[in-house]
Structure formats: structure tokens, C-alpha cells
Swiss-Prot record:
Binds to human integrin beta-1 (ITGB1). This is Streptococcal surface protein A. It comes from Streptococcus gordonii (strain Challis / ATCC 35105 / BCRC 15272 / CH1 / DL1 / V288). The gene is sspA. Disulfide bonds: none annotated. GO terms for cellular component: cell surface; extracellular region. Pfam families: Adhesin_P1_N (PF18652), AgI_II_C2 (PF17998), Antigen_C (PF16364), GbpC (PF08363), Gram_pos_anchor (PF00746), Strep_SA_rep (PF06696). Residues 873-888, 912-927, 1501-1523 have a biased composition (Basic and acidic residues). It comes from the Bacteria. Residues 1543-1575 form a propeptide. Ag I/II A repeats lie at residues 146-220, 221-302, 303-384, 385-466. Adhesin that mediates binding of bacteria to a variety of host cells. Plays a role in the bacterial invasion of dentinal tubules. A host immunostimulatory component, it modulates the innate immunity response. Plays a protective role against some antibiotics and cationic antimicrobial peptides (histatin-5, HTN3, but not beta-defensin 4A, DEFB4A). Purified soluble protein stimulates human epithelial cells to produce IL-6 and monocyte chemotactic protein (MCP-1, CCL2) probably via interaction with integrin beta-1 (ITGB1). S.gordonii, a commensal oral cavity bacteria, is among the bacteria most frequently identified as being the primary etiological agents of subacute infective endocarditis (found in 13% of cases).
Length: 1575
């Protein structure tokens, strides 16, 4: 094997400085910037006043925002995917080395070429592929060297054989030449004699011919003169005859005319005769017809009778003949058999007699021979016994001598073989040692030569690059300056037609690659080129013109089983189609491979040998496209689509499901996923590279579009192509035909200006194009065509539902159609670094071998004796086979004869009928005979020219026999050129490997959560995976993984160690970095068999995420043997509560809300709320940011809760009215609510829940909880469905008597994390009704409370209602005055008035001024028996008052004092069914001195409030002095010093007493009420 010395320069390379240095170095100096958290992350009850940065989420626990990433983490992630160094890979070359040795031995010139650098394999598959390529290359080289060696050996042998053969052939050719020369000379002499005789005969014949020719020519001239004379006479006679014939014809035609007239009259008369004859004939014919019918019937009967008789007669005669013949034949056969039998038996008897004689003679001969045999046999046996005894004696002497010789030789051989074995052992040790020296020398030489060759190549490259560097740098800087200037101009013109709306330089030069090499892999089916050609041939109109038009291809011709092949086959206008044209490239050569895909299947195309493509001036070596037939494609007529993949990647693909029938509501889309690679076979990471999306046609029945793409759409100003709903197409107009559907130009070329825009070289091709700005190593875009009505509404101009072909040709390239887009063609050059020259090795000297021992001389073995052959025994005679006599033939049997048949009898015939007689017909008169045609004279016969006499035949000069060609002297064949000594070349290959790594992020259930959401406090695991180590790798001496963790991630060292067996795990708290080093046992496993791949172990980091709205990004570094380092991909997970999260569009702040609403659903936060009103609290359970969450089952089991910390001093809960619904109003089940009077009254589980969420309730609270957290998570949380809780609460009635503010706050708890709502504040106004006593309606008049009212005096109770402040929450439904007066002292007159106490604003904007009479808006009820008057505002009036308006009214009840005494009175003001008592008024009526006898006043009927009467001012009678002895007329006899029963001397409790009295006595339940909201 060719050994290659392993050289690791890692310790001095950039790997140590960049990869490890970035992590390990930063880890040593990084300063932790993450707040230290308690071990129990859910316990947050610390009272320390620590200033922290919060997230914008109203979190109650763990509110801190995520800190800045550590320097180590930032630097590591910035270098994600980067690699330094590589691991060498060895591949065996034993067969190649042997082939080289054999070639040298055969004399072949062997040259070792420079070692082939196979580069660096970056994946296991690529590594295996490259190792296979090297093995294949070695095998191929060995095979070629073997073939060359064998061929050369055969050529040497063949050369010698050919030389001998040619010498023999040259001699035979010379002998043959001499023989042919002699025969040639004799033939020449013979031919010359014959030619002289033929020439003399020819000259005599020529003289006679010339004489005969002159005589013939004279006779022909005389004949011509005679013919001319006869011709003149003939022409004169012909003229005379023609004139006479014309005159005769004229006379004949006149006679014919006259004859015709006469015959016409005769014909008329004959017609009458003809009719009479026809009548007579018709009668005769009828009779004749009947006769013939009768006759025919009789004849038929006779014929049938005759036929029957003849048939029977014939059958009889045939049968008679057959019987007679059969009997005769039988008789003749019998007689012949008797005769033959007699003859045969006579012959047999004679033969049997001869057999008897032959058998007797044979027996006598046999007996004599047997006697002689027995005598000869006895003599032979005696001679053989004597010979055998002599042989046995000689054999015994031979065997004794042989044994002696063999033992002597065996002893000599054993001694020799031992000496040989000893010699071999010594030399084997020397050879082994020399082989090691040789291998070490060869390895050192190979390594040195490889290094030297590389150094020389690197040095030449360095010198060249050094010389070119200034020019390259200047060219780069000049181009950058030009681009910068161009971008300034583009910015000025970005709104002009054809310019990019977002100016940019094109960093991707990817316009045309006609020489690209294509390879395909697919899970669909590859198609044969012959099948594709056969399918194209059905397009006879184009195919016959040698045009390949994919748009017409009927894919149903590609669906047969034998159309499929296992490997890619190219088709196009090349090979036997060279000179054909295509609609893809006209006369340009176009090649493509074909596949057949079902929906969802894909084909991966790898394009290599790229020559003209660059990114930022850097060469692109390879492009890989994955084309997938989109599952949403709606083509109908087939289930598979054809993809023609062009070898030029910039031409794209042609996709078709067209079967010859256009389809409605159809579509075909291809998803394109692609990656570009540089010359080091590394994916190119694009940074806003522009990809052209062009030729997006839109007709009224079809739209071509791009969708589902990575990157950003860049519009070209003036283009019809735009972006809508994430799709790129002509969004606003058609672009097919000028003037149609807003199209500015016509797509195809015609006479219109600007037409033909749909061509890459059209100046306005930008009209149907746009661009996509892409970033990252891998991008994607889906392109296709769809029926217009599937995208936009049906329209007779813009979108018609006609059929279309489900096919499209599209290309994705860098040919941006916008004008003046500058291209970046120059890569920024890197200053070259000079290589280091290697040192030549010192070679070891091989040791000489021991000489071989001398072979011994052996004795010859004796010659064995030869036994004299035995005499053969004589042959015993065989007894003869005697002949058997033949038996006689049996006599023939006499035949039995048949009887002859009976002859038939004929039936008599019927008689024939009488035949009718034919009538006598009249004879028609003959016509006049036609005139006789004249006899014309015959025209004279023209003279016949006498033929010329033929000229005599001129004799032909004889063909003289040519003299034979003399034989050519043979040219001796040249002896063959000796074979040229061939030269064979061979080389070794070097290969490096870069094992790939991958970081995965999972939740506690092992679910991948990369780029998703998990709840705060969730356990998050990072798995650090490395692909299998390749076969042929060097020994693994170290295997280290370093992971700088994200801030806000609580690392669990113990759990990490448990999950990372096979590694020593350490954690640096200062830099928040964990390091894993493979243990010795793990390294031993890796090194157990270096010739085979080995799977690696992977450690797992375990911890929790602690911040709301945080993004946790992480990658790690793998370092192997200090020779290879690589940084992994970056994984990312986010916690909810982060707006503008690119991975989770629904993510936003977690903000539960609480809003107070009235029953109409209006927001009443901050408004005045009347006692007795119901607050419809609307609690929003904010879950939309959790959409797509992938939290673990452990996190889900922490549950989902909603807490309402309500003010129990002001509100009563209404659990019967609680509702839970989703955002669409659908009722939600599975959520329970429980009310607790205090935290202490709640279960321990609830107390712990609130404590861990850091929520402190003030008193009573409600707890809403998900009954089944897992189902709740599945249905609402993971779907991002927020819930709305309607939680009605009623303001306590007694709270209106004191008034005051009340506050309300709620919390949602998700996964154990709490979030608070805003505080909702409302105020309950204090309602304080007032009562006065007045004598007028003037509100400024004196209040008589506590004063005197005269007997029979009319006065008013002024009832001032409570003030309803402005900005109140509820409409007034009830505002009433209930006065329970003392009917013993007061009499209600039935008159009242109600006035507005202040300005009122109505909902329609009108204003009712203070003091306005509102009596008409009230109703009154009187209970005279119990002394109760109720004045109630009409509800429809109350509801017209604006909520923004205050309200207060007062009512005057007119009373008459009818008794003496002191009377007290309180009224009740009811507001929305809540009663408020007024102050108590007291008045006294003294005994009048001379009272008039009162006139009884009838109890008045209630007045119609709609027609009020103004109460009259009562007249107070002047008291008269009465006789003191007369009794005083009072209604109730009381002592003057005693208060009435309705009075009291303590009014402090009267409001409550009055309310109780009204409820108990009057029954407020009888007042008109609104129905309860729950009904």
C-alpha cells in the first residue's frame, strides 16, 4: 500500500484561533451578564428591590427580560457552519502497486504522476462516494496497466511471428514472378500473329464497301425525282373529285326533307292501327298467360313425377350395380387367394427341406472345432505358469534395492530442506525488515515528492497570483466604483419604466451555461429518449417540419411501461436530430432529460461543468435543483406529468400534463428548491442575490405565476407583474394582447410598436418580469400556470372559463430584465501568501539476504523387472444358431354374397290444357322509302414514295487482341516495425474528510421545537449530534464539543451528565459554557476498527428557559484531534410574548384584558355605576401568541387558569350568568369556575398555584380552570384561540347609600406563569333624596320643615329626587317618588307637579332646561286608605336621556292639613329598583282659637297626569274665637301633648324604617319592575 504520512498543522493553524479560540478563549474571559436565578425557578417571592428590565408582558412571576448573549455565544453563532482543517482518509492501493511491479518486469516504461487531490468530503455520502471513486480509480489504473502490459507482451510475440511469415511470403512471390514472366513472352508472340491476319481481311472488305455505296446513292436520287411528278398530278385530281361530291350531297339532302314529311302522315295512321292491335294482343296475352300457368303446373307435376321415378330408378340401378360388383369382386378375390395360398405353401415346404440340410452341416463343423480348442488351451496354461514364477523372483530382488535407495535419498532431502527452511526464515526476517525500510523510504519519498510538487505548484501559483494581484485589485475597485455610480443613477430613475423599484447590483451572474453537465435522481420514472421521440412524432404538423415543440407534446404517449428506463437519457436537436429546430432555442442545440412524476414526487438535478456563472465574482462550480410536482396541481386527464429538464440550468424545465385536450379549472405547479456551490463544493450563502422571474404571461384564461418563495419580491417599475397575496403574477392587467384587459403591449411580435415583449432580447421584456431578492444557502420558489378563474373572479374580459393546456416552460436564472442593472463580475482578491518549501528526507539502506543452501545429489532408483506377457488362451468356438422351419399359410375363407335390389314403378302423368289461338292483327301501312344516298367518287390515292435503297454496311475494323500486361516484379514486404515500448502512468489520490454535525433542540417529550414556541419555564434540551466517522480515518485522540449557552437558559448540570453518557461534562458558570470531552472508553470504541465507519455518541444539554418573549439561539463547536473543527447550525426556540417573531407570526405580548360593560355591551370602565346595576365583566384569556406552541406534557400539566380578584365589598357574583366563549362566540366547555371568600379559604393546591405565579389576591376571588389541561391545550392553546369570559357581578344595593369607588383586577395563569390585566375602576354615586314642606311651587320658597301648618291649610310636600351624575353606565329604567304620608293629619288633594331639577341632555341632542314641567312624563298612583302616593317617571322617557347627562327631578304633592297635632313624614326615592329614604320633615298644627266648622272635602279621584290641573292656592280661614266650653272638631281625638302614632322624637333611623315600612306595608314588589336579566 502506498502510505501517506499524516501531518497535522492544527495547533499553528487558524482553527485554533477561530473555532476553539472563539469558544474557549471567550469562555475564559467572558463576563456573565445574566441575572443569577434561584434554583426553584417558579418561586419568586423575594421582596428585594432589584431593578430589572422587563419584557412588556404583564408577568407576575419571572418578569425579567432576556439579557444580552454572551460574547462566546454571539461569536460562535456568527460563525455557524464554518469549518477549519480536515481529517485525512486512507484508501488501499495494493492492486495498483502489483500492476506497476508487473509492468516494470515486462519492460514497460512506468511513470508515477502527481498525487490527485480529491479534495475534502463534507458529508458521509460524499466521503463514501469519493472513497469509492478512489478505489475505482485505483482499480481502473491497475486494469489499464495490466492491459497495456499484456498487450505489449503479445505485440512482441506477434512481431517475431509476423517477421518469419513475411520472409517466407517474399520468397514465394519472387518464384511466382519468374514463372509468370516466361508465360507472358509466349502469349505476346501468339497475339501479334493473329492481329496481322485480321488487319489484312479488314482492308479488303473496306474497298468493296466504298464501291457499293456510290451505286446506292445514285439510284435513290432518281427515285426522288419520279415521286415529285406523281404528287403534282394527284393533288389536281383530288380537287375535282371533292367538288363533284359536294354537289351530289346537296341534292340528296333536299330529297330527304320531302320524304320525311310524307312519312309523318303515314306514321299517324299507323299509330291508330298499332293501338287496336295492342288491345287485341293484350286480350290474347291474358288468355295465353292463363294457359301457360296451367300448362306449367301440369308440366311441373309431370317433371316432379318423372324426377321421382328417375331418382328411384337411378338409386336402384346404382345399388344393383354395387351389389353385383361387390359379389363379383368377392368371388374373384377368393379364387385368387386360393391360388396364392397354394403357391406359397409349396415354396415354404421346399425352403424347410433346405434348412434341415444346412443345420446338419453346421453342427458337424462346430463339434470338430471344439475338440481342437480344448487341446490348445491346455498348452497355453502350462507356458504362462512357468513365466510367472520367473517374474516373481526378479521382483523380490528389485524391491529390496529400491527400499535402500529411497531411504538414502530421503535422508539427503530432509537435511537439504531443513537448511532451506533455516535460510528462508533468516531471509524472511531480513526481507521484512527491508520491506519496512522500503515502505518507510517510499512513504517518505512519496510524501516529499507530493509536498515538493505541491510546493512547486503553489509557488508557481503564488508568483502568478502575486503578479496578477495589483491588476485584479484595481479591476475589482474600478468595478465597485462603476457599480456605486450606477446605483446612484438607478436610484434617480427607480420609478421610471423598466427600472428596479429597489435599485441593486446583480451579484448573481447566471445567464447561460450551454456546456453544463446534468445528472438526475428521482423517485419518479426516467423516460427513454426513444419514447420521448415517439411522443413528439405524433405532433405530425411540426415533427414533419423537423420542429420539436414541447407545448404540443401529448404526455399520454409517455405513460407506457416500456417507456421507462433506469438511467437518464438525453433528447433534443442533436445526434440524428441535428439541424432540427425547437421552440425553446430555435436553431440552438437544446438537450433535455425526461422524467414522469406523480403529484408530490420530485427529481433532483445536479448541474456541473459550469463555465460562466459567478456570485460576487466568485466562480460557481455546481447548482443543485430539486423539482417537485406540487400536490396542489389540478390537472385532470392524467395522473402523472412530464418534466423535461434541460442540461443548461438557466433554461429551467418544461412541465406538462397536456394530453391533447384543453382543460378547465386546471393548474400545474413545480416547486423549485436550489443551492449553489463554490469551487470548494461549499454551499454559497446568498445575500440579497437577484433571481429573475420573467415571461409571466397572463391571458384571459390562463395565469403564469410564482408563489411560496423564499426572499423578497422586487418590482420592476412599469411592469405588469406584481405581488398579491404572496403570489407573483400580472396582478392588475392582462399582458397578452395590446388593449385587451389593460395590456400595454402584445406578447408576440407583430406590426404594433412594443410588440414581442415576451422574448429575452426584447428591450421591454421587463413588462412581464420581476425579481426575487434571496438570501441564505438554500432557497425555493414554486412556479406554474393556472386557469385564470382559479385566481380571480370570472369576468368576460379578465377571466374566462375556457380550457387551457396544463403545461409551462419556465426558467430561473440571473438574467434580470430590468434596464441598466450593473453586474458584479469581479471577486475581491486576497493577497497571496508564499508557500513553505519542504525538506528532502534521509533514506534508510536495505540489508543483504543470506545465500541459499546447495541442493544434494540423489541416487538413481533401480529399474523394476518387466514381466513376460502371458500367452493368450485360444478362442473357444461358438455353437451355431440353427434355422427354424417356416409354418404353412392357412386356406382362404369362402365369401358371403349380397341379394340384388327390387326395381321401381313409374306414376302416370296428368293431361296438358288446351292452348288459346292468337288473334289476326291489322297490318300497318309502309312508309315511303328514303331517297337513295348519292354515290360519291373516291378520292384519288396519293402517290407512294419508293423507299431509298439502304446504304451498304461499312465493315468494322476488328478489335485487335491487346498485348497482355507483363507481370509486375514483386515488391518485397517490409519487415514489421518492432513494437514501441509503451509508457504507462499511475498516480495516488489524497482525500480529506470533514464530518458534519447537527444541533437539534427538543422539548421534554423529545419533540423537535426548532423555530417554534415553548412556554416559559419549559425544559429545553439541546442534542449535539455528529455524523458517523468515516472508514479510513486516522485514530481519534480527542473528541471535544463546546456549547456556549444562551442567556436566560437555566442549565441543569446533573440532568445533562445523566443524558450524556460517554463524555466528561464540565460547566463554566462565568461564561455560561458547557464542554463535553469523549471518555477513553468512547475513544476506544471509535478506534476499534478504523477501516469501517463508526456511529458517534451525542451529548444532550438539559435546562429551562426563564424569560417571556425571549429567543434562545444556540450552536456548538466540535474539535477532533486538534486537526478539524466545525461549528454547527444554529437552533432557535422562542417563548411567547414577543411581537414581530419571524418564526411565529402569531407571537405577541401576553396581555389578558378585563373590561367592564353594561348589558348592552358598552364599555363602562371609569363610569358611574348605580347600585343594583349588573357589571358584565369581559375577561379576555389571551392565547393567540401560543399558536404552534410545542411545550411538553410536563409544562401542560401545570394547567391553565384565570383568576378574578373582585371587590366583594361592592359586588355580588352571579355564577348563574357566567359564560365562556371563543373569539367567534362559540360556547366553550371544559372550563370550571370556583369562588373562594379568601386565599386562606382556598385549597392548598390553589394557594400554591397563586404563590408560584406570584399573584396576591386581596380578598374573595374567582378561579376559572381547564378541567383537562391536555385537551384545553390541544383545542385552544396550541391553536392560538383566545377565550372570552363574561363574568357578571351586581353592585350591592347598600353601596348606593354610601357611594364610593371599587376596583377589579384579573390574572391568567398559563403553564404556571401568571399575567395581570389592567385595573378596572368604577364609582357608585351616593343617592340622597331630600324632602321639604312648601306652600308654593317656587323652589326658593321657605321650607316649613319644623314649623307650623294651620288646620285645613293647603301646602306641598316637595320631594327632591337623588342626583344621578353624568357619565353613568346604565340607562334609567326606574325613577320614582313614594310618599307614605300620615293620612291622619294630611289629606292628598290629588294634585301634583314634577319638574326638572337641572338641565337634561337627551340622546337626540336636545336639552330640557332646569325647571321644565315634566308632569306629563310621569304617572301617579294613590292609596288613600294607607296614605301612599307614588309618582313614577315613564320608562320610555327615562331611556331617551343620554348616559352623559346628569338627572334629577322633584315632585310637589299638594296636601291639606286636616288634624291638629305634630306630624312627621319621610318619602322613598327609587332608582332602578333600589330604594333610598329621604330626610324626615316635621310640622305642627295648633288648635285654632275660633275655628270654622270645616267643610268636608270629598276624597278626590286621581287626576289624569296628561291633563294636569294647577293646584289652587288654598284659603286659610281666619280663626274665630270659639266658646271654650264647646268641643274641638278634630278627626282623631288625641291629647295635645301626645304625638301622633306616625310620629317619633328620633328620626335618625327613619330612612331605614321608612324603607322597611314601604317594603312591608306597601309592598315594593307591587311596583312595576323590569324582568330579571337572566330571564
Amino acid at each position: 500500500m502506498n502510505k501517506r504520512k499524516e501531518v497535522f498543522g492544527f495547533r499553528k493553524s487558524k482553527v485554533a484561533k477561530t473555532l476553539c479560540g472563539a469558544v474557549l478563549g471567550a469562555a475564559l474571559i467572558a463576563i456573565a451578564d445574566q441575572q443569577v436565578l434561584a434554583d426553584e425557578v417558579t418561586e419568586t417571592n423575594s421582596t428585594a428591590n432589584v431593578a430589572v428590565t422587563t419584557t412588556g408582558n404583564p408577568a407576575t412571576n419571572l418578569p425579567e427580560a432576556q439579557g444580552e448573549a454572551t460574547e462566546a455565544a454571539s461569536q460562535s453563532q456568527a460563525q455557524a457552519g464554518s469549518k477549519e482543517g480536515a481529517l485525512p482518509v486512507e484508501v488501499s492501493a495494493d492492486d495498483l502497486n502489483q500492476a506497476v511491479t508487473d509492468a516494470k518486469a515486462a519492460g514497460v516504461n512506468v511513470v508515477q504522476d502527481q498525487t490527485s487531490d480529491k479534495g475534502t468530503a463534507t458529508t458521509a455520502a460524499e466521503n463514501a462516494q469519493k472513497q469509492a471513486e478512489i478505489k475505482s480509480d485505483y482499480a481502473k489504473q491497475a486494469e489499464e496497466i495490466k492491459k497495456t502490459t499484456e498487450a505489449y507482451k503479445k505485440e512482441v510475440e506477434a512481431h517475431q511471428a509476423e517477421t518469419d511469415k513475411i520472409n517466407a511470403e517474399n520468397k514465394a512471390a519472387e518464384d511466382k514472378y519468374q514463372e509468370d514472366l516466361k508465360a507472358h513472352q509466349a502469349e505476346v508472340e501468339k497475339i501479334n500473329t493473329a492481329n496481322a491476319t485480321a488487319k489484312a481481311e479488314y482492308e479488303a472488305k473496306l474497298a468493296q464497301y466504298q464501291k457499293d455505296l456510290a451505286a446506292v446513292q445514285k439510284a435513290n436520287e432518281d427515285s426522288q425525282l419520279d415521286y415529285q411528278n406523281k404528287l403534282s398530278a394527284y393533288q389536281a385530281e383530288l380537287a375535282r373529285v371533292q367538288k363533284a361530291n359536294a354537289e351530289a350531297k346537296e341534292a340528296y339532302e333536299k330529297a330527304v326533307k320531302e320524304n320525311t314529311a310524307k312519312n309523318a302522315a303515314l306514321q299517324a295512321e299507323n299509330e291508330a292501327i298499332k293501338q287496336r292491335n295492342e288491345t287485341a294482343k293484350a286480350n290474347y296475352d291474358a288468355a295465353m298467360k292463363q294457359y301457360e300457368a296451367d300448362l306449367a303446373a301440369i308440366k311441373k307435376a309431370k317433371e316432379d313425377n318423372d324426377a321421382d321415378y328417375q331418382a328411384k330408378l337411378a338409386a336402384y340401378q346404382a345399388e344393383l350395380a354395387r351389389v353385383q360388383k361387390a359379389n363379383a369382386d368377392a368371388k374373384a378375390a377368393y379364387e385368387k387367394a386360393v391360388e396364392e395360398n397354394t403357391a406359397k405353401n409349396t415354396a415354404i415346404q421346399a425352403e424347410n427341406e433346405a434348412i434341415k440340410q444346412r443345420n446338419a452341416a453346421a453342427k458337424a463343423t462346430y463339434e470338430a472345432a471344439l475338440k481342437q480348442y480344448e487341446a490348445d488351451l491346455a498348452a497355453a496354461k502350462k507356458a504362462n505358469e512357468d513365466s510367472d514364477a520367473d517374474y516373481q523372483a526378479k521382483l523380490a530382488a528389485y524391491q529390496t534395492e529400491l527400499a535402500r535407495v529411497q531411504k538414502a535419498n530421503a535422508d539427503a532431502k530432509a537435511a537439504y530442506e531443513k537448511a532451506v527452511e533455516d535460510n528462508k526464515a533468516k531471509n524472511a526476517a531480513l526481507q521484512a525488515e527491508n520491506e519496512e525500510i522500503k515502505q518507510r523510504n517510499a512513504a517518505a519519498k512519496t510524501d516529499y515528492e507530493a509536498k515538493l510538487a505541491k510546493y512547486e505548484a503553489d509557488l508557481a501559483k503564488y508568483k502568478k497570483e502575486l503578479a496578477e494581484y495589483p491588476a485584479k485589485l484595481k479591476a475589482y475597485e474600478d468595478e465597485q466604483a462603476q457599480i456605486k455610480a450606477a446605483l446612484v443613477e438607478l436610484e434617480k430613475n427607480k420609478n421610471q419604466d423598466g427600472y428596479l423599484s429597489k435599485p441593486s447590483a446583480q451579484s448573481l451572474v447566471y445567464d447561460s451555461e450551454p456546456n453544463a453537465q446534468l445528472s438526475l435522481t428521482t423517485n419518479g420514472k426516467m423516460l427513454k429518449a426513444s419514447a420521448v421521440d415517439e411522443a413528439f412524432s405524433h405532433d405530425t404538423a411540426q415533427y414533419s417540419k423537423k420542429i420539436l415543440q414541447p407545448d404540443n407534446l401529448n404526455v399520454s404517449y409517455l405513460q407506457q411501461a416500456d417507456d421507462v428506463t433506469s438511467s437518464m437519457e438525453l433528447y433534443g436537436n442533436f445526434g440524428d436530430k441535428a439541424g432540427w429546430t425547437t421552440t425553446v432555442g430555435n436553431n440552438t442545440e437544446v438537450k433535455f432529460a425526461s422524467v414522469l412524476l406523480e403529484r408530490g414526487q420530485s427529481v433532483t438535478a445536479t448541474y456541473t461543468n459550469l463555465e460562466k456563472s459567478y456570485y460576487n465574482g466568485k466562480k460557481i462550480s455546481k447548482v443543485v435543483f430539486k423539482y417537485t410536482l406540487d400536490s396542489d396541481s389540478k390537472f385532470k386527464n392524467v395522473d402523472k406529468a412530464w418534466l423535461g429538464v434541460f442540461t443548461d440550468p438557466t433554461l429551467g424545465v418544461f412541465a406538462s400534463a397536456y394530453t391533447g385536450q384543453e382543460e378547465k379549472d386546471t393548474s400545474i405547479f413545480i416547486k423549485n428548491e436550489f443551492t449553489f456551490y463554490d469551487e470548494n463544493d461549499q454551499p454559497i450563502n446568498f445575500d440579497n442575490a437577484l433571481l429573475s422571474v420573467a415571461s409571466l404571461n397572463r391571458e384571459n384564461n390562463s395565469i403564469e405565476m410564482a408563489k411560496d418563495y423564499s426572499g423578497t419580491f422586487v418590482k420592476i417599475s412599469g411592469s405588469s407583474v406584481g405581488e398579491k397575496d404572496g403570489k407573483i403574477y400580472a396582478t392588475e392587467t392582462l399582458n397578452f394582447k395590446q388593449g385587451q384587459g389593460g395590456s400595454r403591449w402584445t406578447m408576440y411580435k407583430n406590426s404594433q410598436p412594443g410588440s414581442g415583449w415576451d422574448s429575452s432580447d426584447a428591450p421591454n421584456s421587463w413588462y412581464g418580469a420581476g425579481a426575487i431578492s434571496m438570501s441564505g444557502p438554500t432557497n425555493h420558489v414554486t412556479v406554474g400556470a393556472i386557469s385564470a378563474t382559479q385566481v380571480v373572479p370570472s369576468d368576460p374580459v379578465m377571466a374566462v372559463a375556457t380550457g387551457k393546456r396544463p403545461n409551462i416552460w419556465y426558467s430561473l436564472n440571473g438574467k434580470i430584465r430590468a434596464v441598466n442593472v450593473p453586474k458584479i463580475t469581479k471577486e475581491k482578491p486576497t493577497p497571496p501568501v508564499a508557500p513553505t518549501e519542504p525538506q528532502a528526507p534521509t533514506y534508510e539502506v536495505e540489508k543483504p539476504l543470506e545465500p541459499a543452501p546447495v541442493a544434494p545429489t540423489y541416487e538413481n532408483e533401480p529399474t523394476p523387472p518387466v514381466k513376460t506377457p502371458d500367452q493368450p488362451e485360444p478362442s473357444k468356438p461358438e455353437e451355431p444358431t440353427y434355422e427354424t422351419e417356416k409354418p404353412l399359410e392357412p386356406a382362404p375363407v369362402v365369401p358371403t354374397y349380397e341379394n340384388e335390389p327390387t326395381p321401381p314403378v313409374k306414376t302416370p302423368d296428368q293431361p296438358e290444357p288446351s292452348k288459346p289461338e292468337e288473334p289476326t292483327y291489322e297490318t300497318e301501312k309502309p312508309l315511303e322509302p328514303a331517297p337513295v344516298a348519292p354515290t360519291y367518287e373516291n378520292e384519288p390515292t396519293p402517290p407512294v414514295k419508293t423507299p431509298d435503297q439502304p446504304e451498304p454496311s461499312k465493315p468494322e475494323e476488328p478489335t485487335y487482341d491487346p498485348l497482355p500486361t507483363p507481370p509486375v516484379a514483386p515488391t518485397p514486404k517490409q519487415l514489421p516495425t518492432p513494437p514501441v515500448v509503451p509508457t504507462v502512468h499511475f498516480h495516488y489520490s489524497s482525500l480529506l474528510a470533514q464530518p458534519q454535525i447537527n444541533k437539534e433542540i427538543k422539548n421534554e417529550d423529545g419533540v423537535d421545537i426548532d423555530r417554534t414556541l415553548v412556554a416559559k419555564q419549559s425544559i429545553v434540551k439541546f442534542e449535539l449530534k455528529t455524523e458517523a466517522l468515516t472508514a479510513g480515518r486516522p485514530k481519534t485522540t480527542s473528541f471535544v464539543l463546546v456549547d456556549p449557552l444562551p442567556t436566560g437558559y437555566k442549565f441543569d448540570l446533573d440532568a445533562t451528565k445523566a443524558a450524556s453518557t460517554g463524555f466528561d461534562t464540565t460547566y463554566d458558570e462565568a461564561s455560561h459554557t458547557v464542554t463535553f470531552k469523549a471518555t477513553d472508553e468512547t475513544l476506544a470504541t471509535y478506534n476499534a476498527d478504523l477501516t469501517k465507519p463508526v456511529e458517534t455518541l451525542h451529548p444532550t444539554v438539559v435546562g429551562r428557559v426563564l424569560n417571556d418573549g425571549a429567543t434562545y439561539t444556540n450552536n456548538f463547536t466540535l474539535t477532533v484531534n486538534d486537526a478539524y473543527g466545525i461549528k454547527s447550525n444554529v437552533v432557535r426556540v422562542t417563548t411567547p410574548g414577543k411581537p414581530n417573531d419571524p418564526d411565529n407570526p402569531n407571537n405577541n405580548y401576553i396581555k389578558p384584558t378585563k373590561v367592564n360593560k353594561n348589558k348592552e355591551g358598552l364599555n363602562i370602565d371609569g363610569k358611574e355605576v348605580l347600585a343594583g346595576s349588573t357589571n358584565y365583566y369581559e375577561l379576555t384569556w389571551d392565547l393567540d401568541q401560543y399558536k404552534g406552541d410545542k411545550s411538553s406534557k410536563e409544562a401542560i400539566q401545570n394547567g391553565f387558569y384565570y383568576v378574578d380578584d373582585y371587590p366583594e365589598e361592592a359586588l355580588d357574583v352571579r355564577p348563574d350568568l357566567v359564560k365562556v366563549a371563543d373569539e367567534k362566540g362559540n360556547q366553550v366547555s371544559g372550563v370550571s369556575v370556583q369562588q373562594y371568600d379568601s386565599l386562606e379559604a382556598a385549597p392548598k393546591k390553589v394557594q400554591d398555584l397563586l404563590k408560584k405565579a406570584n399573584i396576591t389576591v386581596k380578598g374573595a376571588f374567582q378561579l376559572f380552570s381547564a378541567d383537562n389541561p391536555e385537551e384545553f391545550y390541544k383545542q385552544y392553546v396550541s391553536t392560538g384561540t383566545s377565550l372570552v369570559i363574561t363574568d357578571p357581578m351586581t353592585v350591592k344595593s347598600e353601596f348606593g347609600k354610601t357611594g364610593g369607588k371599587y376596583e377589579n383586577k384579573a390574572y391568567q395563569i398559563d403553564f404556571g406563569n401568571g399575567y395581570a390585566t389592567e385595573v378596572v375602576v368604577n364609582n357608585v354615586p351616593k343617592i340622597t333624596p331630600k324632602k321639604d314642606v312648601t306652600v308654593s311651587l317656587d323652589p326658593t320658597s321657605e321650607n316649613l320643615d319644623g314649623q307650623t301648618v294651620q288646620l285645613y291649610q293647603t301646602f306641598n310636600y316637595r320631594l327632591i329626587g337623588g342626583l344621578i351624575p353624568q357619565n353613568h353606565s346604565e340607562e334609567l329604567e326606574d325613577y320614582s317618588f313614594v310618599d307614605d304620608y300620615d293620612q291622619a293629619g294630611d289629606q292628598y288633594t290629588g294634585n301634583y307637579k314634577t319638574f326638572s331639577s337641572l338641565n337634561l341632555t337627551m340622546k337626540d341632542g336636545s336639552v330640557i332646561k332646569a325647571g321644565t314641567d315634566l308632569t306629563s312624563q310621569t304617572t301617579a298612583e294613590t292609596d288613600a286608605a294607607n296614605g301612599i302616593v307614588t309618582v313614577r317617571f315613564k320608562e320610555d322617557f327615562l331611556q331617551k336621556i343620554s348616559l352623559d347627562s346628569p338627572f334629577q327631578a322633584e315632585t310637589y304633592l299638594q296636601m291639606r292639613r286636616i288634624a291638629i297635632g305634630t306630624f312627621e313624614n319621610t318619602y322613598v326615592n327609587t332608582v332602578n329598583k333600589v330604594a333610598y329614604a329621604s330626610n324626615t320633615v316635621r310640622t305642627t298644627t295648633p288648635i285654632p282659637r275660633t275655628p270654622d266648622k270645616p267643610t268636608p272635602i270629598p276624597t278626590p279621584k286621581p287626576k289624569d297626569p296628561d291633563k294636569p290641573e294647577t293646584p289652587k292656592e288654598p284659603k286659610v280661614p281666619s280663626p274665630k274665637v270659639e266658646d271654650p266650653s264647646a268641643p274641638i272638631p278634630v278627626s282623631v281625638g288625641k291629647e295635645l301633648t301626645t304625638l301622633p302614632k306616625t310620629g317619633t322624637n328620633d328620626s335618625s333611623y327613619m330612612p331605614y324604617l321608612g324603607l322597611a315600612a314601604l317594603v312591608g306595608v306597601l309592598g315594593l314588589g307591587q311596583l312595576k319592575r323590569k324582568e330579571d336579566e337572566s330571564n
